[in-house]
Curated annotation (Swiss-Prot):
<dbReference type="GO" id="GO:0004488">
    <property type="term" value="F:methylenetetrahydrofolate dehydrogenase (NADP+) activity"/>
</dbReference>
<dbReference type="GO" id="GO:0000105">
    <property type="term" value="P:L-histidine biosynthetic process"/>
</dbReference>
<keyword id="KW-0028">Amino-acid biosynthesis</keyword>
<dbReference type="GO" id="GO:0035999">
    <property type="term" value="P:tetrahydrofolate interconversion"/>
</dbReference>
<keyword id="KW-0511">Multifunctional enzyme</keyword>
<keyword id="KW-0560">Oxidoreductase</keyword>
<feature type="binding site">
    <location>
        <begin position="165"/>
        <end position="167"/>
    </location>
    <ligand>
        <name>NADP(+)</name>
    </ligand>
</feature>
<dbReference type="InterPro" id="IPR036291">
    <property type="entry name" value="NAD(P)-bd_dom_sf"/>
</dbReference>
<comment type="pathway">
    <text>One-carbon metabolism; tetrahydrofolate interconversion.</text>
</comment>
<dbReference type="GO" id="GO:0005829">
    <property type="term" value="C:cytosol"/>
</dbReference>
<dbReference type="InterPro" id="IPR020631">
    <property type="entry name" value="THF_DH/CycHdrlase_NAD-bd_dom"/>
</dbReference>
<keyword id="KW-0658">Purine biosynthesis</keyword>
<dbReference type="InterPro" id="IPR046346">
    <property type="entry name" value="Aminoacid_DH-like_N_sf"/>
</dbReference>
<protein>
    <recommendedName>
        <fullName>Bifunctional protein FolD</fullName>
        <ecNumber>1.5.1.5</ecNumber>
        <ecNumber>3.5.4.9</ecNumber>
    </recommendedName>
</protein>
<keyword id="KW-0554">One-carbon metabolism</keyword>
<keyword id="KW-0521">NADP</keyword>
<comment type="function">
    <text>Catalyzes the oxidation of 5,10-methylenetetrahydrofolate to 5,10-methenyltetrahydrofolate and then the hydrolysis of 5,10-methenyltetrahydrofolate to 10-formyltetrahydrofolate.</text>
</comment>
Amino acid sequence: MTARIIDGVALSQRIREEVAERAAALTAQGVRPGLAVVLVGEDPASQVYVRNKVAACEKAGLHSVKEQYPADLSEADLLARIDALNRDPSIHGILVQLPLPAHLDSHKVIEAIAPEKDVDGFHISNAGLLMTGQPLFRPCTPYGVMKMLESEGVTLRGAEAVVVGASNIVGKPMAMLLLAAGATVTICNSKTRDLAAQTRRADVLVVATGRPRMITGDMIKPGAVVIDVGINRGDDGKLCGDVDFASAQQVAGAITPVPGGVGPMTIAMLMVNTLQAAERTLTP
């Protein structure tokens, strides 16, 4: 058996086209959706991510602002800039690119973003709303994964879902969204005993660990849907995920590739969240 490939590029393109249509309609009403992306330092990977996000927004008709600051920017200055963006009516979404330099408290910086402009969904208020099943914004990567599962017609109600990785950015919100969809959810972390025993139970397996090719085909239930959130460079210098694609593809029923899987969906859902933030400004 060779797994069906879940094409994140094609799905994200359809979502971007829908965003462009809705953004044009909103702009015609006098509100052009606006996203501010804040980058501190010169991390090469972060620069690529930010460039891709800004380009995607502009292509879809959203107003985007990139604010780049030196790595030695003080926390007070960064917080002051976020406060100014909070008060700027032309900006509906604010994204601070992580990771931040070590001297900056990422929790404090995220908490400084107005919850209604927190399009990453990381603010503690938005995390709480997600936990209670009333999300204002769904974090972009888990949101993108849910859209991929939906596009594949995956039945989540009653399914065994296993999430490998328990970060605040992917693992925990991913588990909450799967739980809300009716799945029975197991979250695995670095302390999990016999990880393979857990992953082999999964009808839906989501992996977000940052460890190249750690999930191999013998750890996967035959026919499972495998979502690989990881993006790493292997020893050969090539991009790879947290799942060993070659062996997993022989066992899984469907699988996301790296690149071309979850990554494009993350950017697409950032645009959706920004659009929704702008649309809410027209709602009394």
